[in-house]
């Protein structure tokens, strides 16, 4: 199938990914007002057309944090990305690398920092939640440094966990626990189950 729009990809994901993990990516906390506001803000961004100008030397390259990239965008951190598709973080990092843009690995990733580093050739960014357990956070920073991550992306809004209604309804928790309520949904996605069984990281 040829994917032309983001909606095409959303529809395909709905068919292939178990509902709990599909809804996790598309939902937010509480009334989801911030999620809606963010979407509305992106819709307001538009390109200004310029005509009758020389575009033969157009260039989207940009330096960010001392590194030259093909365009000034980055893949944002997505928690549990490896549950959308087996080795999801690795595949996303490789895709970002092929397009010449930075990838940001989430603290809540399925694939480890080391696993992503072993399967990529360019440094990636690491997202760190600012948490009360300073010793744990320090260990994560040390691992990111050892993996030669080129930037640390701080997330500061973890003081209070938001109530995610879709996750509650779907029985999704961290650490992930398989319950009878969603076993049938998993069974209905045999290809997803088969890919997960063959993934590089099953922890």
Range-by-range predicted roles:
Residues 74-86, 126-135:
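Active-site mouth loops of central-metabolism enzymes
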Residues 73-76, 101-105, 124-128, 152:
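Hydrophobic faces of well-ordered beta-strands that scaffold small-molecule active sites
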Residues 107-108, 156:
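Short secondary-structure boundary segments
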Residues 113, 120-133, 140:
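A structural-propensity feature for long, helix-poor, extended segments
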Residues 61-72, 81-93, 109-121:
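N-terminal active-site wall of soluble small-molecule enzyme domains
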Residues 1-67, 171, 175-203:
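An N-cap/entry alpha-helix motif that binds or orients negatively charged groups
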Residues 18, 75, 96, 154:
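Conserved, mostly hydrophobic/aromatic
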Residues 93-94, 119, 135-203:
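Alpha/beta enzyme core
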């Amino acid at each position: 199938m040829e994917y032309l729009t983001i909606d095409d990809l959303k529809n395909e994901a709905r068919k292939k990914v178990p509902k709990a993990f599909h809804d996790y990516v598309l939902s937010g906390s509480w009334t989801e007002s911030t999620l809606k506001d963010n979407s509305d803000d992106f819709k307001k961004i538009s390109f200004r057309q310029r005509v009758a100008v020389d575009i033969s030397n157009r260039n989207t390259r940009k330096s960010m944090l001392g590194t030259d990239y093909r365009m000034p965008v980055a893949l944002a951190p997505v928690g549990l990305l490896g549950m959308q598709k087996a080795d999801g973080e690795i595949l996303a990092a490789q895709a970002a690398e092929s397009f010449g843009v930075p990838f940001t690995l989430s603290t809540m990733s399925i694939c480890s920092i080391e696993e992503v580093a072993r399967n990529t050739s360019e440094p990636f960014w690491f997202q760190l939640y600012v948490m009360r357990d300073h010793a744990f956070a320090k260990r994560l920073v040390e691992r990111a440094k050892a993996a030669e991550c080129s930037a640390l992306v701080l997330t500061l809004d973890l003081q209070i966990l938001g109530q995610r209604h879709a996750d509650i309804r779907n029985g999704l928790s961290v650490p992930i626990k398989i319950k009878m309520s969603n076993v049938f949904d998993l069974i209905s996605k045999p290809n997803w189950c088969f890919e997960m069984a063959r993934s590089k990281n099953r922890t």
